[in-house]
A protein has these predicted regions:
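C-terminal catalytic core of Y-nucleophile DNA break-rejoin enzymes
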Residues: 4-5, 73-92, 105-128
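Short alpha-helical segment immediately N-terminal to, or the first helix within
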Residues: 36-37, 151-152, 165
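Active-site-proximal segment of tyrosine recombinases
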Residues: 46-48, 139, 149, 157-168
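Catalytic-site neighborhood detector that most strongly recognizes the C-terminal catalytic loop/helix
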Residues: 68-72, 166-191
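Conserved tyrosine-mediated DNA breakage-rejoining catalytic core shared by Y-recombinases
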Residues: 49-78, 82, 87
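Helix-turn-helix DNA-binding elements, focusing on the entry/boundary residues of the two helices
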Residues: 33, 44, 146, 159, ...
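Catalytic phosphate/metal-binding cores of nucleic-acid and nucleotide-processing enzymes, i.e., regions
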Residues: 3, 38, 50, 114-115, ...
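Basic, Lys/Arg- and aromatic-enriched nucleic-acid-binding interface segment
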Residues: 11-40, 44
């Protein structure tokens, strides 16, 4: 699905997805993979390549800033992803409940075991399946990231900050991710 047709989720739809994931196998993993897109703005391919060592400090705490090397991101531009404190706490709980062998293990692994990471394509298909089963029409692998950027834009965050968070070199690219809605327009005119 192209970005132009990807849907930015409403708060109610985000909750629908969270409710759906809570009722099914691998609930915590699936919830966190989803939250990494809607609360941290990661691309699905970036979620797929995360390792324990990417997010966990040596003392066992979860980083607030995750560095993604150029060879692991789209267009080969390294970037730092910021993880809010709520998501850090959820990730810490997820990591601490498992017996991790080392920092090279995938953060999110398939049903085949802790050494089997999702491929970006398989994870994109997984998101499509979850959205469909949760009753979200037009949900795609881009929906979480588009939701993240649209949500921040609706709170008045500068397009320059959005571009930085998204790892975009051009604000023109970032603008394609933001879905302007009637509520945003209403709030804007009230500022005058």
């Amino acid at each position: 699905m192209k970005l132009a047709t990807a849907k930015a989720l409403t708060a109610a739809e985000v909750q629908q997805v969270l409710d759906y994931t809570a009722k099914h196998n691998y609930a915590q993993r699936n919830k966190l993979m989803f939250l990494m897109t809607v609360a941290a703005g990661l691309r699905v391919g970036e979620v797929a390549c995360l390792t324990i060592g990417d997010v966990r400090n040596e003392d066992g705490t979860v980083r607030g800033e995750v560095f993604l090397a150029a060879d692991r991101v789209k267009h080969g531009h390294a970037r730092t992803v910021y993880i809010n404190t709520r998501l850090q706490a959820e990730l810490a709980e997820y990591i601490n409940e498992r017996k991790w062998l080392d920092g090279t293990q995938p953060l999110f692994y398939t049903h085949r075991g802790p050494r089997r990471a999702f491929s970006p394509n398989t994870l994109a298909q997984h998101f499509h399946y979850v959205y469909k089963r949760a009753g979200i029409k037009q949900g795609s692998s881009h929906s979480g990231r588009k939701t993240f950027l649209t949500s921040l834009a609706s709170q008045g965050i500068s397009v320059f900050v959005l571009a930085s968070l998204a790892g975009h070199k051009s604000i023109t690219t970032t603008q394609k991710y933001v879905t302007v809605n009637a509520d945003m327009n209403r709030r804007a005119v009230e500022l005058v």
